Amino acid sequence: MAMKAVCVLKGDSPVQGIINFEQKESNGPVKVYGRITGLTEGLHGFHVHQFGDNTQGCTSAGPHFNPLSRKHGGPKDEERHVGDLGNVTADKDGVAKVSIEDSVISLSGDHSIIGRTLVVHEKADDLGKGGNEESTKTGNAGSRLACGVIGIAQ
């Protein structure tokens, strides 16, 4: 049965957006699509974080969702956090049109991202290839510009 989820991204900055998630079968890939506005032109890290807690803004969402205790990587890497969705690219108008298909996240089961926080970051994610310890944890993606809890949609 197809499952759907949605996330409304908001933050202290002008960055905002709506991201949709769609999974046709329980172990199938998840389509991630939508748009984010108010960004600076270029790449911005895009991750699912562990907790759905936004009581202290995006910082209370915890680290990247990583149930397999792996190092940070890119979305196509074998070694990655479940929540590592790579980067979104904003155009000169600050708009990122998101269209990702990912086979590691899920909307059900052990790797479900429902109830967790989606975050868009200030800087590009170096996909774990930055050559320092922070790269293997966060991809050096910098501060959290906007976030929202991923919820079930109809």
UniProtKB/Swiss-Prot annotation:
This is Superoxide dismutase [Cu-Zn]. Zn(2+) binds at H64, H72, H81, D84. A lipid is attached at C7 (S-palmitoyl cysteine). Keywords: Acetylation, Antioxidant, Copper, Cytoplasm, Disulfide bond, Lipoprotein, Metal-binding, Nucleus, Oxidoreductase, Palmitate, Phosphoprotein, Zinc. The gene is SOD1. The keyword Lipoprotein applies. Homodimer; non-disulfide-linked. Heterodimer with SOD1. The heterodimer CCS:SOD1 interacts with SLC31A1; this heterotrimer is Cu(1+)-mediated and its maintenance is regulated through SOD1 activation. Palmitoylation helps nuclear targeting and decreases catalytic activity. One of its GO terms (molecular function) is copper ion binding. It is found in: Cytoplasm; Nucleus. Belongs to the Cu-Zn superoxide dismutase family. The modification N6-succinyllysine is found at K4, K10, K92, K123, K137. One of its GO terms (cellular component) is cytoplasm. It is an enzyme of class 1 (oxidoreductase). Signal peptide: none annotated. Disulfide bonds join C58-C147. It catalyses: 2 superoxide + 2 H(+) = H2O2 + O2. The modification Phosphoserine is found at S99, S103, S106, S108. The modification N-acetylalanine is found at A2. Its cofactor is Cu cation; Zn(2+). It comes from Hylobates lar (Lar gibbon). Binds 1 copper ion per subunit. Binds 1 zinc ion per subunit. The modification N6-acetyllysine is found at K123, K137. Cu cation binds at H47, H49, H64, H121. Destroys radicals which are normally produced within the cells and which are toxic to biological systems. CDD domains: Cu-Zn_Superoxide_Dismutase. GO terms for biological process: auditory receptor cell stereocilium organization; embryo implantation; glutathione metabolic process; heart contraction; hydrogen peroxide biosynthetic process; intracellular iron ion homeostasis; locomotory behavior; muscle cell cellular homeostasis. Its main location: cytoplasm.
